[in-house]
């Protein structure tokens, strides 16, 4: 949906909506992020129960990322003919179905089917969530609405992994996934009662399909920036996906202590998202370069000092502080280089991020199973270093700076 269509929708009184509707979308965002990364905290019991390796269990994140890529690229053509409320309700229902399928999966194949379904929801929801929030409130309240929706995302990054690990020890990994179903049902009922009917607006000329979205890559500096962000997320998730087995097999952390370490990562990440805006305002590209450099250093140090629990907790806290806040910077970059096509650029960025998560978690899993954690962490560091170099090239390119 184009900016012109959104402006028309915002001017339509019957689509003014309510803050309750925005809150409903925020709850949906929380459940979705929790669903996406819940396997990170439950890889070991999932692998043991399904009779597979931890690396193969980690492919549940890879497949969700792959399907999110496809959905984010093609959702605009589908959304153009569907009422936005209907589409959101359908995606929310599918999220609940995914949690149930994974929780009841009798084998690895069904587990992967459930993860593929959540990938479809991820791609569809994030590609249209901002545009939908913009239709629910007056124009001057849009920033607050978007912050509220992203607040659900930020909250999930804090509590999802440690809560998942704790629930896994309490009621098993299947019970942890099953807990997502009532949350999805609450979000579904909330959206059903609070969201107004949101008819698809007239499609204005511009990047409205997958082919013209790819044309954005021809703009100066855009390809470099997308490659830099892609390698950043690949490096991040090739390591982060396998934090739990690393903690258990190398650091010697088990049970509830795993939950505490994951809570440290999430809490540090939440703090990072609160602080990053000020840092970006002062030194934008310097910050985007420094983050992957620091994370690469952390990955390398973990290969040497991974057996020291106190040091590992501090290092992973720094990893969460920097890694969770980095997407804020890259979204700000999107706004800079696509001032007139922010929605199309955002859709392309969603595809890049999800593809990178899929590739990173896949590569990390293959290395973890075949050669051990050190190869995984070395690969992560290498990708992060290349990301930093490409970010420097992006800063020196002729991309618009807003």
Curated annotation (Swiss-Prot):
One function term, GO molecular function aspect: transmembrane transporter activity
Main localization of the protein described in the UniProt heading: membrane
Membrane topology value: Multi-pass membrane protein
PROSITE patterns: MFS
CDD domains membership: MFS_NepI_like
Listed transmembrane segments: 22-42, 60-80, 86-106, 108-128, 147-167, 170-190, 220-240, 256-276, 296-316, 318-338, 348-368, 375-395
Keyword tags: Cell membrane, Membrane, Transcription, Transcription regulation, Transmembrane, Transmembrane helix
Highest taxon in the source lineage: Bacteria
GO biological process: transmembrane transport
Known function: Regulates the expression of oprD which encodes the imipenem-specific porin.
Xref: PANTHER family: PURINE EFFLUX PUMP PBUE (PTHR43124), PURINE RIBONUCLEOSIDE EFFLUX PUMP NEPI (PTHR43124:SF5)
Protein family according to the UniProt entry: To B.subtilis YwfA.
Name under which the protein is recorded: Transcription regulatory protein OpdE
Gene source species: Pseudomonas aeruginosa (strain ATCC 15692 / DSM 22644 / CIP 104116 / JCM 14847 / LMG 12228 / 1C / PRS 101 / PAO1)
